[in-house]
Amino acid sequence: MAPVALLSVSDKSGLVPLAEALHRTHGYQLLSSGGTAKVLEQAGLPVTRVSDHTGAPEILGGRVKTLHPRVHGGILAKRGDASHQADLEQQNIAPIDMVVVNLYPFRETIARPDVTWDQAIENIDIGGPAMVRAAAKNHADVAVLTSPDQYDRLLTAMAESGGSVPSALRRQLALEAFNHTASYDTAIGRWMAEQATAKGCPWLEAVPLRQTLRYGENPHQKARWFSHPKQGWGGAIQLQGKELSTNNLLDLEAALATVREFGYGADGSAPASQPAAVVVKHTNPCGVAVGASMPAALTRALDADRVSAFGGIIAMNDVVEATAARELTSLFLECVVAPGFTPEAREVLAAKANLRLLELAPQAIDVAGPDHVRSILGGLLVQDLDDQAITPTDWTVASQRPPTPQEKLDLEFAWRLVRHVRSNAIVVAKDGQSLGVGAGQMNRVGSARIALEAAGEKAQGAVLASDGFFPFDDTVRLAASQGITAVIHPGGSMRDGDSIKACDELGLAMQLTGRRHFLH
């Protein structure tokens, strides 16, 4: 039996050469409908109309053409399944081996300034996506093409494999097909949302709307929160407090990412590697500390910068008990997130009725996606998260003097923090506590001045971390003048030698990590 290709396309580009190659070179029978069939017939190719194949005419003004068991049965039947083959034989259904479909031009239609609602609705394809998805599902036996850009790739592969479509190509085409239909449906959903709200999310993905927020970063901005119901922040339980805001969620994200540097556990089932607390303001950590206990870590984090902690967001990496809860009530805070809160802690914190308490289990974090997505004008930027493991054994000592054992611990602590600070980023730290943070300055030495000023006299004997290399030796010399004894940075500047020379002159130790951690 000759293989069968079903062709039904809105974009006729490359259609005739493809059909000619399939029929005349590879012996395919051509099955088609509507305008596609007419183009093929005019090119002198033998075509079986879908209506003749099914015995059912097109109805509802063309809304129903291919939605028929003789079409979908032929596409979905598994060739190696005896029961499927018996069904085909009993119903007199011929297998369909290739589906070439591109969809109604919905995006092009809605791009017209004078488009009406009814015109847009009529350009929502139904039968096309159904055939594409059916063929993609059964890619073990069926090849599916959704774009003229794929035709040459298909014909080249068929020529190289004696007329068959390689299984690897069928799988890749299936992947592209599912992405194609997902994008198509997203465009429809986005357009309908825009019609309903006058201004919708321009890159709405297939993520459920969790909540319409009070406003965005500022009161004049509208905002919505889309989230998987059980993953990431969608899996958090708000125990008390006011409704979450856009800024709350952004700060919570920053606080959680920072505190996870020290492990994240709950109820002792997956204990944190070291009790840690983080205070965040405007997505930058302003106080971070580890301690022998959760209350100790919290007190040290707040003491790092109590002025900036006012109105802040706090993340802790283990269960919050009553002692820590009492510390939390000592100042005004927006939100606290932790793996859990004891009943006694809940009772203490209930006195702060507006304080938002969020319980976020490690399981909700573990299943969160691996990508960082940001919107730009007309598109999206998608990158890997900057969460690779920190491995001090890979670092090198650039200075004549190596860091002492305590300096090594402090340098690792500071390096864990600096990648969570907006660039240009500088962190001053000592004994598992941040002492000063310089964030978001346009030059590195400016961030260093801010961090060192915040640390004050505590900078004596502390270390300094920089998220990028030192372009000049000015930061090293400034750090030494304030009592810093060791520095850490990625290295890679043409003038690394100047900074290393300054360290040697001033008695500082310098470690190079070889990895930059810019955060924009």
From Swiss-Prot:
Report if keyword Chloroplast is assigned: no
Please report which protein family the annotation says this sequence is part of.
Belongs to the PurH family.
Protein's name according to its UniProt entry:
Bifunctional purine biosynthesis protein PurH
GO cellular component terms, A-Z: cytosol
Q: Which SUPFAM superfamilies match?
A: Cytidine deaminase-like (SSF53927), Methylglyoxal synthase-like (SSF52335)
Q: Which positions, given as ranges, span the membrane?
A: none
Report the gene name: purH
Highest taxon of the source? Bacteria
Q: Which GO terms describe its molecular function?
A: IMP cyclohydrolase activity; phosphoribosylaminoimidazolecarboxamide formyltransferase activity
Q: GO BP, one example?
A: 'de novo' IMP biosynthetic process
